[in-house]
Regions:
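The AdoMet/dcAdoMet-binding core of the Class I SAM-like
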Residues: 39-61, 84-86, 97, 108-254, ...
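N-terminal, immediately post-signal peptide pro-regions of secreted/luminal proteins
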Residues: 29-38, 190, 389
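SAM/dcSAM-binding transferase cores
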Residues: 39-90, 295-385, 391-396
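Conserved S-adenosyl-L-methionine
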Residues: 255, 280-291
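Conserved beta-strand elements of beta-rich interaction domains across eukaryotes
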Residues: 259, 290, 307-308
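Short polybasic amphipathic segments
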Residues: 98-104
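Short beta-strand micro-motifs enriched in acidic
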Residues: 92-94
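Terminal signal-anchor or tail-anchor transmembrane helices
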Residues: 4-35
């Protein structure tokens, strides 16, 4: 006779919920009950997951939520729920990732790993520009990208445009650690459509534009691509409007999905072509490791308007500006430190797998696309630049 061991009970508790998740049709909040045997004393507790299915690659991402209600309430992880004019807004509590913002059943950020996406979306374009003073942030209703942008001392003004005021109010309540940007005197918040705002903005207004939008489309169970409200932010008319309102040497950075998902990889190629058609140069795809997003990877497309000079000459300046931002060694401003971004990623994030590089760039000569960030030449112990770099930190 087979006797259930603790290991077999554990495997049942894990495997069965995942199997049930894989049988689910699409992105949704899921409550899954796993039971090992008929004996009530050996019954495995309820497991509460939220997951998203990527049918094109047969991949299901699931995060376990808390279930600490004494009454057995499987919704005890739900801290907040509201249907706004545009979407269903939820805040959940998870076991590993802390509080999570969920829009229309799709995880947007978690307290545990939101730093990776938001720091990269903000600091890569901000440090790429030599002295960004005026910045436009489109989307990013959680406030995290804005929070990071305002760490840069050169910033004089930020226009933050988001469509859904309910998302902003929700994040002010549940994620106050990132909501300080809206109280900063340099920020002007606009509750408006991002495409309409860009269309009505005068030419050559901004040094940097960051578009932190939600997914532009989804794919149903039959493989049909369904446009979502953010899709307008990825159309040629809007991309060209962003080009127009950037100053010369301006930087554009847009959220560009995961290269692991075929429809998203196709989108990266399309959006990059749109950027070039609108006049942008040096458009390139950067990668970010974010555990809570499908396949654990997401990326961005960054491009420049009429770039002048060699971007490789800025590498040492990036280190100096980074040190100025976070404060001198031993006296760092804890509110301005980063936990994911550091200057080597200014170049390193564009190092992508060969097959992805070939898919995005084809036979194109990409030698001019990437900043040659030579970490060795910026090492404070480098004899050649010892005097010049004596105050530049070395990040391990």
């Amino acid at each position: 006779m087979f006797v259930s061991s603790p290991l077999s009970l554990f495997l049942t508790a894990i495997a069965l919920p995942i199997l049930l998740l894989l049988l689910h049709d699409g992105p949704a909040s899921l409550l899954v009950e796993a039971v090992a045997g008929d004996d009530k004393e050996n019954q495995i507790p309820l497991h509460n997951f939220i997951g998203e299915l990527e049918e094109s690659i047969g991949f299901y991402q699931a995060i376990e939520l808390t279930n600490d209600g004494d009454d057995g309430n499987t919704n005890s992880s739900l801290l907040y729920s509201k249907e706004s004019q545009y979407q269903q807004i939820e805040v959940h509590r998870s076991k590993h990732f802390g509080k999570m913002l969920v829009l229309d059943d799709v995880v947007q950020l978690t307290e545990r790993d939101a730093d990776s996406y938001n720091e990269m979306m903000a600091h890569i374009p901000m440090f790429q520009h030599p002295a960004p003073q005026r910045v436009l942030v489109v989307g990013g209703g959680d406030g995290y990208v804005l929070h990071e942008v305002l760490k840069h001392p050169s910033v004089e003004h930020v226009d933050h445009v988001d469509l859904d005021t309910d998302v902003i109010q929700t994040c002010e309540q549940f994620f106050p650690q990132w909501a300080d940007g809206w109280k900063d005197s340099r920020t002007k918040l606009h509750i408006a459509d991002g495409a309409k705002f860009a269309k009505e903005t005068p030419s050559e207004t901004y040094d940097v534009i960051i578009q932190d939008s939600s997914d532009p489309w989804t794919v149903d169970e039959d493989g049909v691509v369904i446009p979502l409200p953010s899709g307008v932010l990825y159309e040629k008319e809007h991309i060209c409007a962003l080009y127009r309102i950037l100053k010369p040497n301006g930087i554009l950075n847009i959220q560009a999905e995961s290269f692991n998902i075929p429809t998203s990889l196709d989108g990266i190629i399309i959006w990059r072509k749109l950027m070039e058609d609108c006049g942008f140069q040096r458009s390139r795809y950067g990668t970010i490791h974010t555990t809570s997003y499908p396949t654990g990877q997401i990326g961005f497309l960054m491009a420049e308007k009429n770039p002048s000079g060699s971007i490789s000459s800025k590498s040492k300046d990036i280190w100096k500006r980074y040190q100025q931002m976070i404060g001198e060694s031993g006296t760092e401003d804890h509110n301005k430190r980063t936990t994911y971004y550091h200057p080597p990623l200014q170049r390193g994030c564009f190092d992508i797998p060969l097959w992805v590089h070939q898919k995005i760039y084809g036979q194109e000569d990409t030698s001019d696309l990437f900043c040659q960030l030579d970490v060795e030449n910026m090492d404070q112990n480098n004899d050649q630049d010892e005097n010049e770099n004596e105050n530049i930190p070395v990040v391990a």
